[in-house]
A protein has these predicted regions:
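Helix-loop junctions and terminal segments of transmembrane helices
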Residues: 57-72
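Membrane-interface junctions at transmembrane-helix termini in multi-pass inner-membrane proteins
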Residues: 123-145
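Hydrophobic alpha-helical transmembrane segments
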Residues: 113, 117-120, 145-192
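Membrane-interface helix-capping segments at transmembrane helix termini in multi-pass transporters
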Residues: 34-45, 71-83, 93-124, 164-172
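Interhelical loop/hinge segments that connect adjacent transmembrane helices in multipass membrane
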Residues: 1-5, 141, 168-175, 184-209
């Protein structure tokens, strides 16, 4: 059996196990420590955050993964990587600005504004994490490692510092820290392992994405 296939299979297996185990551990812990009301407010805020993530991610990861898989040349991969990251960065700025406006005008969101502000790191970390690149080059181990970082850091911080319902806002903050750490790790791998630099893309490259 192909070595790369075995490696990717093992990486995906570990990834799926990780994605299953961490929620099983953390959700009962949070409901117990925060209580139903505080946990409900956190969960509602997180759902809004994920809507923004879905909008920013929409279509990009599939098309970008395909483009990376079709082009093995360093020059083209660097252009694709830079273009996708640039567009996502612009979208992050626009949608985070819109989120701040929503917080200021919608009373339900305004009352828990700090949750959304702390959740901005989740939006940035998840949308700018180049998992699509690793999928395109079939290097799933880096996704598994980054995902483990994303899951482990919040878990440890939550267990150490979340004591009661007043700490609900910190759950969002700790998750943001985890996503930002995973994003940073992934970007460093792209930069130093695969020697891809971020360059301002040409207008025609932006239009093709």
């Amino acid at each position: 059996m192909n070595k790369k296939l075995i490696e990717n299979f093992c990486s995906l297996s570990v990834l799926n196990i990780t994605n299953y185990i961490f929620p099983v551990v953390i959700i009962p812990f949070l409901t117990n420590r925060l209580g139903s009301e505080s946990y409900g407010r956190y969960a509602f805020s997180l759902s809004i955050i994920h809507y923004f993530i879905l909008i920013i991610q929409y279509g990009f990861d599939l098309s970008a993964t395909r483009d990376i898989a079709l082009h093995s040349e360093h020059y083209y991969r660097q252009n694709i990587y830079s273009t996708v990251m640039f567009i996502k960065l612009v979208f992050n700025i626009l949608f985070i600005t819109f989120l701040v406006l929503m917080i200021s005008v919608i009373p339900l969101m305004n009352s828990d504004g700090i949750l959304y502000i702390y959740g901005v790191g989740i939006i940035v970390g998840q949308t700018l994490c180049p998992f699509w690149f690793f999928q395109g080059i079939e290097k799933m181990k880096f996704i598994t490692i980054a995902n483990f970082v994303i899951r482990l850091i919040p878990l440890l911080l939550i267990i150490l510092y979340v004591k009661d319902s007043a700490d609900g806002k910190y759950v969002m903050l700790f998750q943001s820290i985890g996503f930002m750490a995973g994003m940073l790790f992934s970007m460093l791998v792209v930069r130093f392992e695969f020697k891809l630099k971020f360059v301002i893309p040409q207008k025609k490259m932006i239009q093709t994405q």
